[in-house]
């Protein structure tokens, strides 16, 4: 357990350090990539324990391989809350905005700013007198959601699906 915790902490510290000196575009793409990885782990903890099935579902080009699909699946399977779903969808839209923009893209652009201001999780935690920038709201949301997804993955492991027993005819009459 200590190894898992220290590994997660090192992973987290590495991400925070990387965010400090990156452009807005890099932060948006790195943050969503990080969340996508954790959503994949969450789903993998929940589905049956079969590496082939996991790869078939969660592989990059497969049904649950995209950030959008993983967000929807995690919510549809009841693995994340409505608020987490809301913020993940907004983060997905923010990321798409940065990917589509051939220029660098910035968090202070009006449409990105609006999406960041709609994130719900920071408003539950940040003090009212604080006025964080859209970039900070985004980074803060990614940080909180990453921790939540790690915690949810450990919960999902206790609810791991198992294949059903052998086929059995049922008399419906």
Residue ranges and their predicted role:
Residues 1-173:
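Amphipathic alpha-helical interface elements
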């Amino acid at each position: 357990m200590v190894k898992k915790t220290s590994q997660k902490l090192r992973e987290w510290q590495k991400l925070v350090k990387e965010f400090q000196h990156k452009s807005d575009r890099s932060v948006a793409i790195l943050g969503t990539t990080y969340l996508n990885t954790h959503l994949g782990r969450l789903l993998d903890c929940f589905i049956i324990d079969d590496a082939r099935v996991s790869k078939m579902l969660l592989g990059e080009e497969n049904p649950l391989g995209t950030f959008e699909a993983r967000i929807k699946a995690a919510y549809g399977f009841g693995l994340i809350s409505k608020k987490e779903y809301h913020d993940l969808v907004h983060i997905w839209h923010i990321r798409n905005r940065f990917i589509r923009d051939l220029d660098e893209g910035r968090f202070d652009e009006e449409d990105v700013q609006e999406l960041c201001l709609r994130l719900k999780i920071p408003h539950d935690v940040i003090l009212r007198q604080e006025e964080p920038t859209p970039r900070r709201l985004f980074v803060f949301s990614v940080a909180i959601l990453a921790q939540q997804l790690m915690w949810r993955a450990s919960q999902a492991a206790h609810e791991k699906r198992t294949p059903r027993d052998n086929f059995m005819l049922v008399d419906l009459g």
